[in-house]
């Protein structure tokens, strides 16, 4: 092993562990590698508990990232694509496919339990191209646009602001600004609860969110 190049070692390391359909690459004993959440998801599959399929990126990727000038392992991209393909096969839908899009949640985890400290981004896979297909499939435009605005809010907060290391403008984070826009919209339309908003309301707010993100963070929400 000592004569292997860094590239060769990188290619041979397993960075992505699959779970789903009652099988899993990992086990409950692998919390140091998969984090507590990833290890438990693997174990639940081994126990036959119905769990939506997915995959866990190992804690080693985080260590590699910080040990290598914030660069990711070369083989991670291909391993992720393979894991996503296998997840698509189990679910019977495809990520980014306009007619029947696969949506995924991205949940952070750690070797030690940290309740309330870890971030989550839901509904990844919803875009202007995939929204019509999901509306057609569900027959519920309110559900879809509500899910889309949640994606926009979480992605802007977790990825575009916090992960990018941006300081909140005037001490007010982007998530708080977007939540204020919802309250303003409710007040203008004499709504009391979020449940009063229609699909058209959430659609309109989604576009308003994008403008606010551009103005506040100086970047476009990726569609």
PLM segments and residue spans:
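Nucleotide/phosphate-binding sheet-loop regions of phosphoryl- and nucleotidyl-transfer enzymes
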Residues: 3-223
